[in-house]
Amino acid sequence: MSFVPTKVFFTKGVGRHKEYLSSFELALRDAKIEKCNLVTVSSIFPPKCERISVEEGLKHLKPGQITFAVMARNSTNENNRLISASVGVALPADETQYGYLSEHHPYGETAEHSGEYAEDLAATMLATTLGIEFDPNKDWDEREGIYKMSGKIVNSFNITESAEGETGLWTTVISCAVLLP
C-alpha cells in the first residue's frame, strides 16, 4: 500500500487536567483532532501537498480513522513551568520537490522562540538537501534571508503552542501537521 498525502492542515491545542493522559486528551480536543487514531510520522512535507484550513481538514476526518500526523508534544505538572510545542515548515519553490516539517518541544522557551527554532530546523534541513550554501553559525534571521534569496526555498513558517504549568494539574501542549489522502 502506497500513501502519499495530498492535503495537510495545521492545528494546535492546550489541555489541563489532574491526570497526565487526560491533559493530553484535552489538548487533542482543543486542537479538534481527538476523534482520530493518530499515528506520528517523520518530517517530510510531500511534493504537491496542498495546505488547507483546519475547518476544511476536519471535514475529511471520521471518528476512529487512522490519521497520520507530525506532532510536537510537551507536558508538565510543575507550577509556572513554561512549555511549548512547535512544528516548523519549510517548502521548496519547486512544488515537485519535498519540503520539511520539524518538531521542537522545549521547556522554558516562549512560543516565539520555540517557533523560530522549529522553523529554522525545517529550513536548514531543506537547505542542505537543495545544496544552498550557508553558515550554520549565523542567526536565523540572516540564514532565512539567504535561504529565500536563493530562490530555492519559497516559504517557511511554524505553528506553536505554549503554556505555563498550574499547581495540581498536568498541562499538555501540542502542535500538529495532519496529513490527509
Curated annotation (Swiss-Prot):
Quote the gene name from the UniProt entry. pdaD
Q: Which InterPro entries match?
A: Pyr-dep_his/arg-deCO2ase, Pyr-dep_his/arg-deCO2ase_sand, Pyruvoyl-dep_arg_deCO2ase
Kindly list the organism's lineage.
Bacteria, Pseudomonadati, Chlorobiota, Chlorobiia, Chlorobiales
The record's NCBIfam families line, in alphabetical order, gives:
pyruvoyl-dependent arginine decarboxylase (TIGR00286)
What Pfam families does the database record attribute to this sequence?
Answer: PvlArgDC
PTM sites of type Pyruvic acid (Ser)? 43
Know the name of this protein? Probable pyruvoyl-dependent arginine decarboxylase
Q: Where is the signal peptide?
A: none
A GO BP annotation: arginine catabolic process
Family named by the database record: Belongs to the PdaD family.
**Residues the UniProt record annotates as site (Cleavage (non-hydrolytic)):** 42-43
* PANTHER family, per the entry: PYRUVOYL-DEPENDENT ARGININE DECARBOXYLASE
Cofactor binding note from Swiss-Prot or TrEMBL: Binds 1 pyruvoyl group covalently per subunit.
Enzyme class, top EC level, equals lyase
Its recorded reaction(s) are:
L-arginine + H(+) = agmatine + CO2
